[in-house]
């Protein structure tokens, strides 16, 4: 489980990014581990996130160099084309922690950037289906202490329950990261429990007409999640139990996620 000292440092960096990139508010969506935190925190004691994942709309990729320079000027070190890191002081204990920032974009957007520079990022940061985050999101206020002190606040568009599950399913399919399984488990607590979460998911699904491509992607993500959480002996429940340091037992995790999946309309 991530320590509050580290996640509050990440939230501090998140606030700074939101203020610095405010002009791009409508063209970027917060996804990754912070989205499940903001979605579930009223119903589940989510630990927060260390990494920051921002989905960029394809149309602003021609301006990526300007965005990159803004990030570097904040003190981030560019590790790869879409990945940055920075040492941030935590407002909790005053210690320094390394925070990572990833920009995500669809394959169509990658054409605006020299492909020779993003080979290492292709699977991690460039994939189709990310436009779901722009169809399914909500606005969230972030208020905390900026790096270097001083309270402030800003707003982000945040991937909602449907788009977060879609992207988390994709993540589970491509890597073995315990935090992704934990985030999925957290999302099934939305509105009070798995049945309530599934009702909200179904409502989101009814309110919009998904494209054939996005329907296929969402179905695939949900099938991956089902396979990973099918029984308490599958990797998903093990990952949640391990990440939570045995706070959530495998049988409880498998049952909770199973109830959620059994009650959603899209199969």
Question: How would you describe each model-predicted region?
Answer:
Residues 1-267:
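Compositionally biased terminal segments of proteins
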